[in-house]
Amino acid sequence: MNHHRIWQTVLLIPQGRVAGYGQVADLAGLPGRARMVGKALGEAPAELEIPWHRVLRSGGQIAFPAGSDKAAQQKGRLQEEGVAVLNNRVKMAEFQWWPDLATLLLMEY
C-alpha cells in the first residue's frame, strides 16, 4: 500500500520538475520515510512507467554514484526534459516541484 502511495505521488511530478525523496514521502503521507521512497522506486513495475528520474536527494543531487550508468541515465532523462544538471546536481530553487492545493486535495491512494 505504501509503495502505491509513493508511485502515485511520483507520477504527479511534471516534466521539467523534480522533487526530493523526503518531499515525496511527505506528500504521500509518509513523513520521515525518504528511504522507503528509494526502495519503492526501485521495486516499481516497469509497466507503470514511474518517472523515477525526477526524484533527487534533498540538495538536488543525483543519488546514484557519479559515473555510474544509472547516474548517466538519470542525468540524460532530466536534461531531455529541460532540467539543468551540473556536477550531478540540480538547482532545486529553480526546478523543484511544488504542487498546488487542488493537486494535493485530489490525490488518490
Regions found by a protein language model. Give the residues of each.
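Nucleic acid-binding interface residues in structured DNA/RNA-binding domains
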Residues: M1-Y109
